[in-house]
């Protein structure tokens, strides 16, 4: 059985039919990506828990702030179905990626593209990863730029307008130089496991505060509700939750959710540093991370929507800034969510830098100078984008509709159909085809509608 497994890894294709089905499944579940991984025999490598935190940190970023707005434009049941649907598809696409990596003996998303379609496939995948992750990091830093000055000013006893520490652009540059850049310079993604755990607990605290503050804002929502606490919501038409709803704004639903569940570019680097790595163990890491992220997403979106209903902002924190500007708990949770978003940026930076260096310097040995210069260049790009992109929804919609849907749905399905030698009517190939078609339809349709909406405005 061991020899059979290595023969599969050595071939430039899939030869699953050479094994009995039950033997192939057993090999898939416990096969490592590489037959020679020294760290598997020792105690080095990231633990299961830290790996879960890293995957959750890759999943949970600024997307959590836009989901209440999505629920307001799709309804509670509509949102629940769509969120569950995208989460299941995200988990299944990771399953396909891990299966392909086992049978092709490659360790990166870009190399899967190379294995399937040659050099053009590698370049397309790497370019998609770079664009998507730059868009994600820009949206994270955009939140820092817009929200951090207001969060700081709320703790100040008097007016300090004009001060450098209330200048969003200045704070953004300082944070990128002092925090994001040093963390991004770390050579291994596993080093960020502890900062990822801190980021996740900040997100959980945010969700709990959203639940508690549902009763702090009376309904109907008016500016007179400032400083009111624990008011009972009135049963008016404005305060009745919608189970299903569709409007022009609903077009942002799927792209925003796809953006919120994207962890695929970080899964393989995290897998390579996992203790006792196997396909089954990494799938369990991913499923645990997606399930916990789904829970936090749903709770924060539901109670955020039930707080503001149709008046919910596209960025949830803006609503609390407007109606509860001096609430101490809200002031604290703003800083927590900002730090959580900030700590996500370095994790997303790793796949972007790796993709860029695989395109430009794939034949060169590792160099700290090249590593540092590439990191600095990427940080400079995302700072510029964060300064000049005015609306976070633009980032969510366009990036989610184009690159995120490719990385979650299109590429895993397409590569599996290309590389697998299973019968076309097998369940996995049909699932891969469904994944591919879903991504192509959803991504194209959403992108067209978003552009059409912009033109009308």
Swiss-Prot record:
Protein's membrane topology: Multi-pass membrane protein
This protein's GO CC annotations: plasma membrane; synapse
Residues with the N-acetylmethionine modification: 1
Keywords, sorted A to Z: Acetylation, Amino-acid transport, Cell membrane, Disulfide bond, Membrane, Phosphoprotein, Synapse, Transmembrane, Transmembrane helix, Transport
Main location: membrane
Localization per Swiss-Prot or TrEMBL: Cell membrane; Synapse
Record's catalysed reaction(s): L-glutamine(out) = L-glutamine(in); L-glutamate(out) = L-glutamate(in)
Modified residues (Phosphoserine): 4, 7
Pfam family, one: Aa_trans
Tissue: Expressed exclusively in neurons and not in astrocytes and glia cells. Highly expressed in the synapse. Highly expressed in glutamatergic neurons. Primarily expressed in excitatory neurons, with some minor expression in inhibitory neurons.
InterPro entries in the cross-refs: AA_transpt_TM
Function: Amino acid transporter with an apparent selectivity for L-glutamine and L-glutamate. May facilitate glutamine uptake in excitatory neurons. The transport mechanism remains to be elucidated.
Family: Belongs to the amino acid/polyamine transporter 2 family.
PANTHER family according to UniProt: AMINO ACID TRANSPORTER (PTHR22950), SODIUM-COUPLED NEUTRAL AMINO ACID TRANSPORTER 6-RELATED (PTHR22950:SF366)
Protein name from the UniProt record: Solute carrier family 38 member 6
Organism: Mus musculus
Gene name tied to this protein: Slc38a6
């Amino acid at each position: 059985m061991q020899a059979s497994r290595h023969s599969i890894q050595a071939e430039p294709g899939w030869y699953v039919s050479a094994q009995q089905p039950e033997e192939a499944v057993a090999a898939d579940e416990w096969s490592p990506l590489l037959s020679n991984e020294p760290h598997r025999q020792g105690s080095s490598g990231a633990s299961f828990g830290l790996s879960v935190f890293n995957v959750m940190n890759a999943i949970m970023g600024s997307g959590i702030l836009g989901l209440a707005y999505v629920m307001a434009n799709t309804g509670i049941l509509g949102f629940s179905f769509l969120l569950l649907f995208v989460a299941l598809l995200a988990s299944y696409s990771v399953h396909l990626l891990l299966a392909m990596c086992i049978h092709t003996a490659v360790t990166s998303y870009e190399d899967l593209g190379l294995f399937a379609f040659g050099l053009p496939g590698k370049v397309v995948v790497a370019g998609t990863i770079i664009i998507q992750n730059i868009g994600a990091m820009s949206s994270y830093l955009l939140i820092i730029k817009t929200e951090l000055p207001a969060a700081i000013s709320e703790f100040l006893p008097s007016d300090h307008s004009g001060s450098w520490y209330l200048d969003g652009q200045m704070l953004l540059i300082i944070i990128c130089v002092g925090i994001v850049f040093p963390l991004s310079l770390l050579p291994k993604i596993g080093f960020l496991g502890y900062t990822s755990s801190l980021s996740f607990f900040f997100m959980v605290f945010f969700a709990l505060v959203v639940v508690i503050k549902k009763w702090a804002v009376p309904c109907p929502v008016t500016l007179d509700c400032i400083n009111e606490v624990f008011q009972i919501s009135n049963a008016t038409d404005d305060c009745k939750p919608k189970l299903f709803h569709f409007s022009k704004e609903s077009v942002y639903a799927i792209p925003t959710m796809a953006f919120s569940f994207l962890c695929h570019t970080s899964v393989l680097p995290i897998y390579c540093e996992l203790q006792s790595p196997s396909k089954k163990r990494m799938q369990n890491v991913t499923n645990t991370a997606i399930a916990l992220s789904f829970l936090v997403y749903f709770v924060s979106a539901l109670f955020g929507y039930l707080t503001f209903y149709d008046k919910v902002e596209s960025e949830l924190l803006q609503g609390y800034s407007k109606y509860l500007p001096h609430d101490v708990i809200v002031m604290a949770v703003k800083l927590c969510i900002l730090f959580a978003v900030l700590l996500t940026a370095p994790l997303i930076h790793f796949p972007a830098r790796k993709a860029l260096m695989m395109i430009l310097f794939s034949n060169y040995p590792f160099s700290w100078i090249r590593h540092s210069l590439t990191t600095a260049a990427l940080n400079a790009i995302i700072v510029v984008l964060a300064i000049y992109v005015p609306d976070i929804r633009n980032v969510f919609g366009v990036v989610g509709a184009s690159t995120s849907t490719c990385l979650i749905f299109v590429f895993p399905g397409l590569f599996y159909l290309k590389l697998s030698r299973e019968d076309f009517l097998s369940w996995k190939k049909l699932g891969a085809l469904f994944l591919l078609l879903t991504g192509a339809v959803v991504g194209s349709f959403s992108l067209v509608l978003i552009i059409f909406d912009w033109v009308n405005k």
